[in-house]
Curated annotation (Swiss-Prot):
Record's subcellular location: Cytoplasm
Protein family according to the UniProt entry: Belongs to the gamma-glutamyl phosphate reductase family.
Protein name in the entry: Gamma-glutamyl phosphate reductase
Alphabetized UniProt keyword annotations: Amino-acid biosynthesis, Cytoplasm, NADP, Oxidoreductase, Proline biosynthesis
Catalysed transformations (reactions): L-glutamate 5-semialdehyde + phosphate + NADP(+) = L-glutamyl 5-phosphate + NADPH + H(+)
Function: Catalyzes the NADPH-dependent reduction of L-glutamate 5-phosphate into L-glutamate 5-semialdehyde and phosphate. The product spontaneously undergoes cyclization to form 1-pyrroline-5-carboxylate.
GO molecular function, one term: glutamate-5-semialdehyde dehydrogenase activity
Name of the coding gene: proA
GO CC aspect terms: cytoplasm
Matching NCBIfam families: PRK00197.1 (NF001221), proA (TIGR00407)
InterPro entries named in the record: Ald_DH/histidinol_DH, Ald_DH_C, Ald_DH_N, Aldehyde_DH_dom, G-glutamylP_reductase_CS, Glu-5-SA_DH, GPR_dom
GO biological process, one term: L-proline biosynthetic process
Disulfide bond annotation, renumbered to this chain: none
Organism: Streptococcus pneumoniae serotype 19F (strain G54)
Amino acid sequence: MVSRQEQFEQVQAVKKSINTASEEVKNQVLLAMADHLVAATEEILAANALDMAAAKGKISDVMLDRLYLDADRIEAMARGIREVVALPDPIGEVLETSQLENGLVITKKRVAMGVIGIIYESRPNVTSDAAALTLKSGNAVVLRSGKDAYQTTHAIVTALKKGLETTTIHPNVIQLVEDTSRESSYAMMKAKGYLDLLIPRGGADLINAVVENAIVPVIETGTGIVHVYVDKDADDDKALSIINNAKTSRPSVCNAMEVLLVHEDKAASFLPRLEQVLVADRKEAGLEPIQFRLDSKASQFVSGQAAQAQDFDTEFLDYILAVKVVSSLEEAVAHIESHSTHHSDAIVTENAEAAAYFTDQVDSAAVYVNASTRFTDGGQFGLGCEMGISTQKLHARGPMGLKELTSYKYVVTGDGQIRE
């Protein structure tokens, strides 16, 4: 096993090859990686079977689905890499140019970060997405996968590096930390001088540990306690469709809805219809029904467990939905501001003034009017695959694509000027 220190030194030694690579070279790299990923399908599936067998019974079925790969999912991962090829190269983009009175020309241009570290949990697709985005944005990358997905991740990285071996870029621009202990995560958090940026992707415990302990600059990809508020002026059919999609299409992802707020004027008519869609109809279709966690008012209209205070601060990542009845738009916004992780929140309403108030007052990375929160995604936003959803405000906010993985520098051109 190569030590972490050796890996940090290896990636530092070769980072310039990707930091300054042309768009043509980087695209060749990505295409080779995609081809070798598909070519290694058999090996990746064998590794994934080992991870699945080890994880079964230890994590929920929803989380197992995150971990699971088949040939179609591997092809989708390769397709995601190829989609990044089609995106414009951000490196070298001129952001601003100005000329001073003394004749100096100052150009602000986009440059690579250098080396980016990614700590993530059991999602194999993050491996290929992270590699594609970091390399296309001119960065080398150090990956640290969760233990549950390590065999799969190792097989994926092996395939990607075989692709790199067919290009002019050194395979060491991608490093996979082989040690999946907590110590390896903490080593990355302290790797100042080796990592220029650290991005955690996972649950609240992982993200909080990185944010609280890292001395390397961090972009926080926060958890998603995502709200949908059904206003008194909502279209009921529209609201039912949005909630069904936001909660059930993929409950294990961070843009899935976790909390429903319903105006009290709507509760009596709307909540029984929602129960029909999310519980009865799903049972009839052989699908897992939604389990409600209800406040005292909501429990008057539908069946479910009584909500505990922590239910409104929980990212369930499962077929569970916390429901609260509110007396006004203002109460809904106040609840969101008290409990939100500032990821994605939505209002369903036909009232333009209510929509404007909601979008002005809710301080989240993505705020929706009459649409599912499941659209908070780099691909859906036209950014290609994403590095994560930033819930902080400095440097990057919302889905992080190529530009969010870059910095800038000033190039000052003169003709012998000196400062008096």
